[in-house]
């Protein structure tokens, strides 16, 4: 056993002997004084152990580290019989209720391990923000006996910190970790309450211990980590912000969320990410990108916009979604073939469906009656079937490479009135292009039509002429090269002769 551990052991024995010694206590005042002295001794012993721990977190021989055990303090409310008492009572810091004035300063700037140890010695609860300096040179942040932080824990722009732990920490405001390039492990096993988790640019963070105790949190932002799972938030049902991005090893993401009141964003994680949001009912804004599979079976209401961009999934099922109060976008989903929006009746923003190369038909809105913004359809689809659509308040731009697409439904309105009320309709297919101008009542004000077949023929003639011109240029090219070479040779000869003569 190392010398310092031997000394610590005998120091502990001495303290215990003091408590176990038969003591005659005549008054409550003397009894409290004795217990306060014992608490002071144990506090200094704890500080001594923490100082050693900050410099040697594990034994050189790899054995168990006794410094990881909690130091138990003497209960100042305990009663000591005058003669019969032979044992003593110890309690954990969890029975403490009073907060020292030194623990209510509002801001604690930690420059080194000594600052942190001093704070722990005084405070089981900290009222204010704890900010770890970018100059903090230790590899370990240990919150020790601190149980509550009525404020934020902020650690940013540090290249030394390897591990952050707080075995007794139960609650805090915001946990902000940003640009910690050596940070690997976070261990808060007792954490139950946190207002915001904001983790960014933690490129080698791979281990987090929170144990799923958190049930209430406002914001979850996890960006640019090496995490393979974030299942420690699975008991959370409602958040304001849920933003998971650029976690390159995250292949599965299950969230038991039922409501997101501001923004839900998942993008740029592992290419094969499977996203399970099966319990989600309502969301304000949602953007999903770079996902291989998605489950949204219970989503019924989107209070703003809904976007699916550059995903790999082949099917998208939202059978309960009735209303989107903003824009609905389906963009650059190369494998998307099957969609189900069977209950959607109202999109109050625009409807954008573009560059989904496997999508042959736009026929998955059987009940859609109204679009509050514009229509933008582009791709290789050959059919548009929106049987219940009665009103589009914006313009319509439709372009397909398929020659089978018929634009008549949009460009030849029944009874002379179009369902498009936004001023302009433009529809292009492999057969023809049509453009209409309409007023707010849907009355056609002007029409223009272009036959793309004739355009192709004209392009063909121009192409032939261009081709002939290029042949002439190709035939004349060798002659031009020969002439240029002859001129250069003559110039070189005259240059040499001139230099010899003069």
From Swiss-Prot:
Signal sequence annotation: 1-56
Gene3D superfamilies to which the protein is assigned, alphabetical: Receptor L-domain
Residue ranges, annotated region (Disordered): 441-474
Transmembrane segments: none
Membrane topology, from the record: Lipid-anchor; GPI-anchor
Cell compartments where the protein resides: Cell membrane
Residues glycosylated per entry: 77, 135, 285, 303, 340, 343, 355
Annotated lipid attachment (GPI-anchor amidated asparagine): 475
Keywords: Cell membrane, Glycoprotein, GPI-anchor, Lipoprotein, Meiosis, Membrane, Signal, Sporulation
Principal cellular location given in the protein's record: membrane
Compositional bias ranges of the Basic and acidic residues kind: 448-461
GO biological process terms, semicolon-separated: ascospore wall assembly
GO cellular component term, pick one: side of membrane
Prosegment residue ranges: 476-502
Other observations noted: Present with 238 molecules/cell in log phase SD medium.
Function statement: Involved in middle stages of meiosis. Redundant with SPS22 for the organization of the beta-glucan layer of the spore wall.
The family this protein is said to belong to: Belongs to the SPS2 family.
PANTHER family, sorted: SPORULATION-SPECIFIC PROTEIN 2-RELATED, SPORULATION-SPECIFIC PROTEIN-RELATED
UniProt-recorded name of the protein: Sporulation-specific protein 2
Organism: Saccharomyces cerevisiae (strain ATCC 204508 / S288c)
Lineage: Eukaryota, Fungi, Dikarya, Ascomycota, Saccharomycotina
């Amino acid at each position: 056993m190392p010398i310092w551990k031997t000394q610590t052991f005998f120091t502990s024995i001495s303290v215990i002997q003091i408590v176990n010694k038969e003591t005659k206590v005549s008054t409550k005042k003397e009894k409290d004084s004795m217990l306060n002295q014992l608490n002071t001794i144990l506090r200094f012993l704890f500080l001594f152990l923490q100082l050693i721990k900050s410099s040697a977190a594990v034994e050189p021989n790899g054995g168990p580290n006794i410094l990881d055990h909690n130091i138990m303090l003497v209960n100042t409310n305990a009663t000591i019989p005058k003669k019969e008492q032979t044992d003593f009572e110890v309690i954990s810091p969890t029975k403490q209720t009073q907060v020292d004035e030194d623990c209510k300063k509002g801001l604690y700037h930690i420059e080194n391990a000594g600052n942190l140890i001093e704070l722990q010695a005084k405070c089981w609860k900290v009222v204010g923000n704890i900010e770890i300096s970018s100059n903090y040179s230790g590899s370990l942040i240990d919150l020790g006996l601190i149980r509550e932080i009525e404020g934020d824990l902020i650690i940013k722009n540090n290249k030394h910190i390897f591990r952050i732990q707080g075995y007794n920490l139960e609650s805090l405001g915001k946990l902000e970790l940003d640009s910690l390039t050596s940070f690997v492990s976070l261990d808060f096993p007792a954490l139950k309450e946190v207002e915001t988790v904001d983790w960014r640019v933690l490129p080698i963070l791979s281990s987090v211990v929170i144990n799923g105790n958190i049930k209430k949190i406002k914001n979850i932002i996890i960006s640019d980590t090496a995490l393979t799972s974030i299942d420690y938030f699975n008991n959370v049902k409602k958040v304001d912000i849920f933003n998971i991005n650029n976690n390159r090893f995250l292949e599965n993401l299950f969230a038991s969320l039922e409501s997101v009141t501001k923004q839900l964003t998942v993008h740029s994680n592992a290419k094969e990410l499977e996203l399970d949001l099966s319990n989600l009912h309502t969301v304000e804004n949602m953007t999903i990108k770079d996902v291989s599979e998605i489950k949204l079976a219970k989503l019924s209401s989107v209070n703003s916009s809904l976007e699916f961009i550059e995903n790999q999934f082949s099917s998208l099922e939202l059978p309960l979604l009735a209303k989107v109060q903003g824009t609905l976008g389906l963009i650059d989903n190369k494998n998307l073939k099957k969609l189900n929006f069977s209950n959607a009746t109202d999109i109050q923003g625009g409807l954008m469906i573009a560059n989904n190369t496997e999508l042959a038909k736009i026929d998955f809105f059987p009940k859609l009656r109204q679009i509050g913004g514009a229509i933008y359809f582009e791709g290789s689809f050959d059919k548009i079937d929106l049987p219940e659509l009665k009103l589009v308040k914006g313009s319509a731009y439709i372009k397909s490479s398929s020659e089978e697409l018929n634009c008549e439904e949009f460009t030849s309105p029944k009874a002379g009135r179009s369902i498009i009320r936004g001023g302009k309709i433009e529809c292009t297919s492999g057969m023809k292009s049509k453009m209409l101008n309409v007023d707010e009542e849907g009355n056609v004000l002007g029409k223009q039509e272009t036959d793309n077949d004739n355009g192709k023929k004209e392009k063909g003639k121009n192409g032939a002429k261009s081709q002939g011109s290029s042949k002439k240029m190709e035939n004349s090219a060798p002659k031009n090269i020969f002439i240029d070479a002859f001129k250069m040779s003559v110039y070189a000869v005259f240059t040499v002769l001139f230099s010899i003569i003069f």
